[in-house]
Swiss-Prot record:
UniProt-recorded name of the protein: Arginine deiminase
Annotated Gene3D superfamilies: Arginine deiminase (1.10.3930.10), L-arginine/glycine Amidinotransferase, Chain A (3.75.10.10)
Cross-referenced NCBIfam families: arcA (TIGR01078), PRK01388.1 (NF002381)
Subcellular location: Cytoplasm
GO molecular function terms listed in the Swiss-Prot or TrEMBL record: arginine deiminase activity
GO terms (BP aspect): arginine catabolic process to ornithine; arginine deiminase pathway
Enzyme class name: hydrolase
Active site: 396 (amidino-cysteine intermediate)
Length: 406
């Protein structure tokens, strides 16, 4: 058990969870990638090499890197965790009671690293023993999925997010990602590094249907000084924002939550695809998110367990008030209109801050990286020709577990 605390977006990053590309991305095809929320298929080998460079860049900066597959494998060593995961991932109502029982029994005898591989990478009918016979098997093709792959586990930022002294285990918006949450619930409940830990679970760790109250970590920025910024995107709803805000206020972990409405389209999938915090007074932004007509509210406790909502004139004003600074500095996406749109699509604004003024980002975004450099921001470049095709940058691919405040 270790102490976990994330006090900001820009304080010294000390520990982070990543997920190296694996079997789940090998299951992506042109016919299923849209359903699995990818625009294209990736070269998994090259993506893995790029991810190794990313992870090693963090290690070279003295940051602890934990890999999701390792954490899940170690969690499966706990009998209760394995039983719970098999029950949640292999449903009687989806597979039928006899076939589901046979599959659970077969998976339970599997080496834990191999089982973890399937819990993220999926399982086809062609991979099960011929001795498992059932009408369900007889009516499916060998390439049909018993468990669908979870290629979006690559983006560890979204499934859970640590906020001050606690974590939100997020109810995901799209069916293709909802099973990811169970893997994280098991890790945070049973893995020795987290089990019995002195941290709060704000939201998402109950066996209920969260309906429209969805929330994803790419929309949550812990900007520090008692404030949290949340984007209401195509994935995170006002309902999800309210539940998280109430929990933060109940546990006295935040004084205000700033909620900003984002355009509902693919390029603005999450707040961090268009905006990240990179220094005390500095944000990287795609200009569309800071237009004067973008709606923004500040939520504070109303003293009766509810929320007080204040409409803000602009997002920039709300940030200046929350951070106690006179003027926020904005570094916009680089290049002309065409280059800026291309670089935003390739995650130029989705950088991971390691400490104030030092970020990791894709080397391909030359125009925006040049603007960072001129503004005194150090960019540690990583390749992203394959990783970037998943529509996520260094921030998307990382879940901070420990980070200093400001």
């Amino acid at each position: 058990m270790e102490k976990h605390f994330v006090g900001s977006e820009i304080g010294q990053l000390r520990s982070v969870m990543l997920h190296r590309p694996n079997l789940s991305l090998k299951r992506l095809t042109p016919s299923n990638c849209q359903e699995l929320l990818f625009d294209d298929v990736l070269s998994v080998e090259r993506a893995g090499e790029e991810h190794d460079i990313f992870a090693n860049t963090l290690r070279q900066q003295g940051i602890e890197v934990l890999l999701l597959t390792d954490l899940l494998t170690q969690t499966l060593d706990v009998a209760d965790a394995k039983a719970w995961l098999l029950d949640t991932q292999i449903s009687d109502y989806r597979l039928g009671p006899t076939f589901a029982a046979d599959i659970r029994a077969w998976l339970a005898d599997m080496p834990h690293r191999e089982l973890a591989r399937h819990l993220s990478g999926g399982l086809t009918y062609g991979e099960i023993p011929a001795s498992i016979k059932n009408m369900v098997v007889d009516t499916h093709d060998i390439n049909d999925f018993i468990m669908k792959p979870l290629p979006n586990h690559l983006f560890t930022r979204d499934t859970s997010c640590w906020i001050y002294n606690g974590v939100s285990i997020n109810p995901m918006a799209k069916p293709a990602r909802q099973r990811e949450t169970n893997n994280l619930r098991a890790i945070y409940r049973w893995h020795p590094q987290f089990a019995g830990g002195d941290f709060i679970k704000y939201f998402g760790d109950e066996d209920i249907n969260y309906d429209h109250a969805t929330l994803e970590g790419g929309d949550v920025l812990v900007i520090g000084r008692g404030a949290v910024l949340i984007g209401m995107s195509e994935r995170t709803t006002p309902q999800g924002v309210e539940f998280l805000a109430q929990a933060l206020f109940k546990h006295r972990q935040a004084e205000r939550v700033i909620a900003v409405e984002l355009p509902k389209h693919r390029s603005c999938m999450h707040l961090d695809t268009v905006m990240t915090h990179i220094d005390i007074d500095t944000f990287s932004v795609y200009p569309e998110v800071v237009r004067p007509d973008v709606q923004c509210w500040t939520l504070t406790p109303d003293g009766r367990g509810g929320l007080k909502r204040t409409q803000e004139s602009t997002l920039v004003h709300a940030l200046e008030t929350a951070l106690g600074i006179d003027q926020v500095r904005l570094i916009t996406t680089g290049g002309d209109a065409f280059e800026a749109e291309r670089e935003q699509w390739n995650d130029a604004n989705n950088v991971l801050t390691l400490r104030p003024g030092v970020v990791v980002g894709y080397e391909r975004n030359i125009w925006t990286n040049e603007k960072y450099d001129k503004a005194g921001i150090t960019v540690l470049p990583i390749p992203g020709d394959e990783l970037g095709r998943g529509r996520g940058g260094a921030r998307c691919m990382s879940c901070p577990l420990e980070r200093d405040g400001i």
